[in-house]
Amino acid sequence: IAPTQEGGIYYTGPSDDFSRPGRMWWSVPEGVTEFDTWRELTTVYHEGVPGHHLQIGQATANRGQLNSWRRVLAGSSGHAEGWALYAERLMQQLGYLDDPADRLGMLDGQRMRAARVVLDIGVHLGKPRLNGEEGIWDADYALEFMMRNVNMAEAFVRFEVNRYLGWPGQAP
C-alpha cells in the first residue's frame, strides 16, 4: 500500500460502460506499518458489497432509466450513506459480524459516525462550542472534538475532519 499523508477508505464507481470497474481504495498514512483489522470489516461492507459498490453499480447498470441530472447531480448523501449503513447492519444480522472483535468494530464505526454528525452540524451552522466553551466550531475545535470522541489515529482523524469541512451534509 502506498503511503499518504492522511489515510482513509473510500469507493469510486465504475465507468458508464463498465470498462473500468468500481474500486475500494484503502490509503494508509505514511509511517503506519500496522493497523487493526477488527474495525475494518464493517467498513469493507460499507464501501464494498453490499454497500456503495452495489448501490453505485446498480445506478450505473440502470443508467438508461435515469437522466444525467438524476445520475450525476442529484445524488444524496442521505441515500448513499443510508444505504451503506443499512448494508453494515444487514451483514451483522446475517451473521457476518458474529466475531466479537468485528462487532466491536461496527460499534466503533457507529460511534465515529455519531461524532461526525455533531461536527458537521457544529461547523457548518456555526454553532457554539460544547460544554460552555467560548467561541464557535472551527477546524481546530473540530479536530479536538473528534480526537476526544473517536478511537482513531490522529492522521486518520485529520483526513476525516478535512473531508467533513469540505463536504457539508456528508456525515449521516
Task: State each model region's role.
Residues 1-172:
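Long, His/Glu/Asp-enriched segments that create or flank divalent metal/ion-associated functional microenvironments
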